[in-house]
């Protein structure tokens, strides 16, 4: 890998990896990931993707091995706390939180157990893959406990007699329910985030990073927005504009053959619900279209 190329570490496998690859493709990056390759070169930008384990990404950033990384905040904070405790470098810069990879680290207990608050965890043995995050939360609460560190299948620890409770990642809660557990306390909320190593970048790399950030912003904003078009009676235009959600002042254009109506175009940052569309129609609006946006730049 040339030091002149921007090096970005991403997760090798899993949902976070797929969503990250999709984001980069929407940003205009061309690459082909196949087989067991650990380094993938972009075909149209001076960028190399490193495909690694998710828990290696924070250290690669903190040690200055790569320039950027996409990582879940839970893994990032776990490694940061661990390295800080060991006196190792733990600095990085967060460039932006992304719109995928959402989850939460929660303490779960037996489904039949009554839970009145964190104080009920005093003296418990808690199984987890995230001992640093768990310790940070419990220390803040001033609650004594012991840790059972596991690298997988944490949810079976209570049934196996290894622990009284667990601290594990939760998305829907279905896995907890299947193992006779219930969520008791959320201790950390996480999303994917783009981070950068400390230190200076040359002008070309800095410009490329800024370009990527601008494109990411456009992709994420486009994903959250809709393009709305409709025909509106001129005498009801103000009332119709009041109904349109999360929008700047719309573009209003005359129709070629109908002087009583105008065309209204706008970008909305909120969903247009069926109820709103029905209200628009009741005011005389017609030809109402709600379209996805692929890219946008302000």
UniProtKB/Swiss-Prot annotation:
Keywords: Amino-acid biosynthesis, ATP-binding, Cytoplasm, Glycosyltransferase, Histidine biosynthesis, Magnesium, Metal-binding, Nucleotide-binding, Transferase. Its cofactor is Mg(2+). The keyword ATP-binding applies. GO terms for biological process: L-histidine biosynthetic process. Its main location: cytoplasm. Pathway: Amino-acid biosynthesis; L-histidine biosynthesis; L-histidine from 5-phospho-alpha-D-ribose 1-diphosphate: step 1/9. It is found in: Cytoplasm. InterPro entries: ATP-PRT_HisG_long (IPR020621), ATP_PRibTrfase_cat (IPR013820), ATP_PRibTrfase_CS (IPR018198), ATP_PRibTrfase_HisG (IPR001348), HisG_C (IPR013115), N-reg_PII-like_a/b (IPR011322), N-reg_PII/ATP_PRibTrfase_C (IPR015867). Feedback inhibited by histidine. Transmembrane segments: none annotated. Its EC number is 2.4.2.17. GO terms for molecular function: ATP binding; ATP phosphoribosyltransferase activity; magnesium ion binding. It comes from the Bacteria. One of its GO terms (cellular component) is cytoplasm. It catalyses: 1-(5-phospho-beta-D-ribosyl)-ATP + diphosphate = 5-phospho-alpha-D-ribose 1-diphosphate + ATP. Belongs to the ATP phosphoribosyltransferase family. Long subfamily. HAMAP family: HisG_Long. PANTHER family: ATP PHOSPHORIBOSYLTRANSFERASE (PTHR21403:SF8), ATP PHOSPHORIBOSYLTRANSFERASE ATP-PRTASE (PTHR21403). Catalyzes the condensation of ATP and 5-phosphoribose 1-diphosphate to form N'-(5'-phosphoribosyl)-ATP (PR-ATP). Has a crucial role in the pathway because the rate of histidine biosynthesis seems to be controlled primarily by regulation of HisG enzymatic activity. This is ATP phosphoribosyltransferase. It comes from Aliivibrio fischeri (strain MJ11). The lineage of its organism: Bacteria, Pseudomonadati, Pseudomonadota, Gammaproteobacteria, Vibrionales. The gene is hisG.
């Amino acid at each position: 890998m040339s030091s002149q190329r921007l090096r970005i570490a991403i997760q090798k496998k899993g949902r976070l990896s797929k969503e990250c690859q999709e984001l980069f493709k929407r940003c205009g990056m061309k690459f082909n990931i196949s087989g067991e390759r650990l380094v993938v070169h972009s075909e149209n930008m001076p960028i190399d993707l490193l495909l690694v384990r998710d828990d290696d990404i924070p250290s690669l950033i903190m040690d200055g091995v790569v320039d950027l990384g996409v990582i879940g905040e839970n893994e990032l904070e776990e490694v940061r706390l661990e390295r800080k405790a060991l006196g190792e470098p733990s600095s990085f810069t967060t460039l932006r939180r992304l719109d995928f990879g959402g989850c939460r680290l929660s303490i779960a207990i037996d489904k039949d157990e009554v839970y009145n608050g964190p104080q009920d965890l005093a003296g418990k043995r808690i199984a987890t893959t995230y001992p640093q995050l768990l310790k940070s939360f419990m220390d803040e609460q001033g609650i004594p406990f012991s840790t059972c560190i596991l690298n997988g299948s944490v949810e079976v620890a209570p049934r196996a007699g290894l622990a009284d409770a667990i601290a594990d990642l939760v998305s829907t809660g279905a896995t907890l329910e299947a193992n006779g557990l219930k969520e008791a306390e959320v201790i950390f909320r996480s999303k994917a985030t783009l981070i950068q190593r400390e230190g200076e970048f040359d002008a070309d790399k800095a410009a490329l990073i800024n370009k990527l950030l601008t494109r990411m912003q456009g992709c994420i904003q486009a994903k959250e927005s809709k393009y709305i078009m409709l025909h509106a009676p001129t005498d009801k235009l103000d009332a119709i504009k009041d109904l349109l959600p999360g929008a700047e002042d719309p573009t209003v254009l005359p129709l070629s053959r109908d002087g009583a109506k105008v065309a209204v175009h706008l970008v909305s940052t909120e969903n247009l619900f069926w109820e709103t569309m029905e209200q628009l129609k009741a005011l005389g609006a017609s030809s109402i279209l709600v379209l996805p946006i692929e890219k946008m730049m302000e």
